[in-house]
Amino acid sequence: MNMKMNKCPDCKIYTMEDACPQCGGELKVIYPPKFSIEDKYGKYRRILKKEAMNKKDD
């Protein structure tokens, strides 16, 4: 068992178990990634944000 809070994307249940207690499915970690001055994925995040804004305007 890990000591981080997880969430089942199907059941929307929060737990600290390794598998969802209701459906037995895979869990996702809910914590954001650590902050880094050298933002490796900033370029991609900005591209996705720009695309989302363009879709919203259409």
Swiss-Prot record:
Similarity-based family: Belongs to the NOP10 family.
Annotated function: Involved in ribosome biogenesis; more specifically in 18S rRNA pseudouridylation and in cleavage of pre-rRNA.
GO cellular component: ribonucleoprotein complex
Disulphide bridges, residue numbers: none
Signal peptide location: none
Name used for this protein in its record: Ribosome biogenesis protein Nop10
Gene3D superfamilies hit by this protein: H/ACA ribonucleoprotein complex, subunit Nop10
GO biological process: pseudouridine synthesis; rRNA processing
Molecular functions (GO terms): snoRNA binding
Keywords: Ribonucleoprotein, Ribosome biogenesis, rRNA processing
